[in-house]
Amino acid sequence: MAPRMLIAAIGGATGSGKTTLAKHLGRIIPSLLVFQDDFAPPEDKVPIDPRYGWQDWDDRPGAIEWERQREVFHSIRESGQVPPEHSSHDHLNEQVPVEIDVETERKWSERFAALREQLGPDLPKIVVTEGFLILVDPETSRQFDLQFFLRGDYATLKQRRIDRQGYHTAEGGFWKDPPGYWEKCVWPAYLSAHAPLFVDGDVETGAIDPQQGIELFETQEMTMDDMVNRVCERIYAEVQNKSTAAAEPEANGH
């Protein structure tokens, strides 16, 4: 029998705070972290944009090895573990720290510790995943119990991308955006990939299509503490719901 699982996915543009939020959650909640960047193709397989002659790491079709991602999440759902052949290079990339209040971390750490003690082996295995395209593949999204989208404004996201300098690749290389890459590649690819999730395709200011089951976070209006609190609330409630649902058949003698 497949283990009880709860998978929470955090999407949004580059620089929106996804990874920072996921790592805060990983420190608070006994959980497994999965980073979508680890599903990027090898450097020599990244498509070349014929218009500009540079590698395109951001356009949806070639930015992720989609079948590998689907297989890993299916395996996680079925076994509760990451396949042994899957590896992460997240540790190579430095992040600008965005701290949260110690009281926020303490409060939720204690609540989840108490929940773990209360439920024991009935506590679902919790997985937190994040990525700039993590919500756009319907086959992968079917594995998610909770979905969150972090929306930021153009100017802030662009400046954060500039400040980041570049990205380490799984092979040990380093990718630095060429001039114009944000305007000609990153931003258009982000809008195109996420348009199906929004009413009238309006990614920048529109509402998320209610059928998607995604909760929208406006990062210009929320602190990191706000987002940590909101996601912890949702995960905590979902754990309780799953535990209640699992206990009902036993109570009915089934």
Label every model-predicted segment:
Residues 8-10:
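Hydrophobic anchor at the beta1->P-loop junction of P-loop NTPases
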Residues 13:
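P-loop (Walker A) phosphate-binding loop of NTP-binding proteins
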Residues 21, 25:
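Hydrophobic positions on the alpha1 helix immediately C-terminal to the Walker A/P-loop
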